[in-house]
Amino acid sequence: MGVIRAVRSLDPFGSLLLGLAVLAFLFPFVESSGSARTFLLLPVAVALLAGWLAWERHVKKSKPFDPMVDMQIFRFPSFRLGTMLAGVYFMGITSIWVLVALYFQNGLGYSALVAGSVGIPAAISSSFAANWAGKRVADRGRRVVIDGITVALTGIVLTILALVLHHVTGLSEWWMVLTLFLVGTGQGAVIGPNQTLTLADVPLNYAGSSGAVLQTAQRIGTAMGLALITAIVFASSRAINWPLGTAIGFGTIGSLMAVALVIALYDNRLRAHRSAR
């Protein structure tokens, strides 16, 4: 009987609408043909999303079954801002290792094995940073995320400097291992703590749908960022050269990280204001 009740509580039409909206939104960014016509799906995605929101409000009001996502979760500032931060952050950070692989293979002529090994120190530092941040997020709150983004952003700026100096002065490309080490360290201190803080104020009965919304924002940000940033790098590299083209790509990532930092600072300010009341 419990299984039957669970099946009856599902929202198949809402699931279909949201699935089609996400598909229409992501397809132009992941379609390898690069046809501009695929971007005509974006208005369709907006229309489908609007239809889904209207349907979810109808389900909430008439209560034939549970809505997929109760829009009440968006009344929590920590959830709204944390989800925004995750989407913007993933739009930038996930493209870094793609750019590193492209630069070392296409720009410098190294093998895929060597290009992949560049990120090993960063991966190790990320695991230690994640452990460190996880133990402190309960006490320090959003400051952990702010510090992580700041460290990662510092690494990105130094990576841009290393790329420019490599082109201008012949500085060894292996300095990037050190700058990317900072990026990895910061990265490890952001993702887990942000998820914890984003969902901390959400009631348990909203936990499943809230986590799904957060993960969807991350996946959409990743798809958009990879398409946008790699397109910028390929266009810049053809027009200029690989070092400066890659530097422009890292500059784009840094801009997105700066936006994520502003969101984190704003959320931290709201939390401090609520605590002071």
Please name every model-derived segment.
Residues 1-84:
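Hydrophobic transmembrane-helix bundles of small-molecule transporters
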Residues 6, 272-277:
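Short, charged juxtamembrane terminal tails flanking transmembrane helices
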Residues 38, 63-272:
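12-transmembrane solute porter fold
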